[in-house]
Amino acid sequence: TDYTQDASLSGTHYQGMTRVATYVKEQRAEYKNVFLSDSGDTIQGTPLTYYYAFMKKDVEDPAMKVMRMMDYDMWVVGNHEFNYGMDILQRQLNYLTSESTETESKVGVSMANYLDANTNNDKTRDWKTWNSYAPYVIKEYDGVKVAVMGIGNPNIANWDVPENWKGIYFAGVVETYKHYEAEMKAKADLIVIVTHSGIDGDPEKSDFIRELVSTTNSIDLVFSGHEHRNGVTKIANTDGKEIPVISPGTKAGVVGRALFTYNKATKTYTV
């Protein structure tokens, strides 16, 4: 989240995607089954991203390119992705999701609550997603199936001008999850949420993780975004079980990591 930054070459607190790439490489060497995702606010916020969005349109955005080169599994769009307008965002998405090459891999995109505005509104839902992006993916690791759902921030309509999110209907987060909940439970042993949201509600209703976890009992892990805080928060679900929420910081200063150990015989896990 928020990978790019303005940084001095002096000092010892270096950040950036080269260090993240090294860490990811180490994790993949140690663990066979790794899922790598990003929770948004990736292509806006610095002179570098502005330059490639507006001045160097014929060259791939470096933030998108590095995700492809690092073989990311999923990207969830953040609210700042819409600041440059839909044309620029769509260009970035088209590149990110283009077919793999010898040096780059296609990256999946998921925002289950971003729906096609042509067929979804406040009164009607057919749950067709914007751009037909998958509402979630199922990954199988040594016989264990994991559902990973991306959820975008629904408050973008209050932050950006309408032309910047033209064609999207923003559905409620809890409503969206519960629409797919039974389907994911039937298909997967574990359910993970990657979302561009903070944890606790605010007056703008842009942070909804506590509401989501505390009103359900099927989510096993959440990766947050939006607040750009760093740390782990545990939230009790409706069964009283504490679910970890990992907040992965900002500007590639830290990497949020969860390690699942799953017992197929008892269908239980530690994280």
Q: What do these predicted regions represent?
A:
Residues 1-271:
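Acidic, metal/ion-coordinating pockets
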